[in-house]
From Swiss-Prot:
Alphabetized InterPro entries for the sequence: DDP-like_NUDIX, NUDIX_hydrolase-like_dom_sf, NUDIX_hydrolase_CS, NUDIX_hydrolase_dom
Positions with a binding annotation for Mn(2+) 3: E78, E82, E144
Residues binding Mn(2+) 2, per UniProt: E78
One function term, GO molecular function aspect: pyrophosphatase activity
Binding site for substrate: F60
Major localisation: mitochondrion
Sequence similarity: Belongs to the Nudix hydrolase family.
Function of the molecule: Probably mediates the hydrolysis of some nucleoside diphosphate derivatives.
UniProt binding sites for Mn(2+) 4: E144
Cofactor entry: Mg(2+); Mn(2+)
Protein name: Nudix hydrolase 16, mitochondrial
Presence of the UniProt keyword Hydrolase in the record: yes
Amino acid sequence: MCDLVARTGRLQQRYEDGSRLVAGCIPFRYVNSDKDGNSESGKVIQVLMISSSSGPGLLFPKGGWENDETVREAAAREAVEEAGVRGILMDFLGNYEFKSKSHQDEFSPEGLCKAAMYALYVKEELATWPEHETRTRKWLTIEEAVESCRHPWMKDALVEGFCKWHKEKMVKGEEITGEH
């Protein structure tokens, strides 16, 4: 049984200029690049994607940013609720705009959304999480994730946001700490 409960409803949602504000993350980890586990060969980065609750394709965890939390808190919460992972929320990757047919409401009749995306270094995978009965999670290489992205804006967040950030910050040896 899962002690965590996913937030639901739109009463506490944030809106700005007719767009629903969303927070999300691209969870990542490093694995050995060879089958034998020989660390001398280096590490490969993998990103975690989740199944959609409304159709085919894979997604990164994201959801509404609510009035009682910061955008970083919302991104971390969505990672736990939708993907069942916790870790170190790293840098801001960018804002990505998209339209959502399922999130049209009185505050955003056109379904416009603006997602603030972050990198999340995964430290813990939970056995159960709030949406574990409706979502599956899958670790993928960057190339596999690009091919699997359900939404073009998420592909942009991965390629233009995450990959550029990783190359600039992580490949140059920045330490992973909780001080971001």
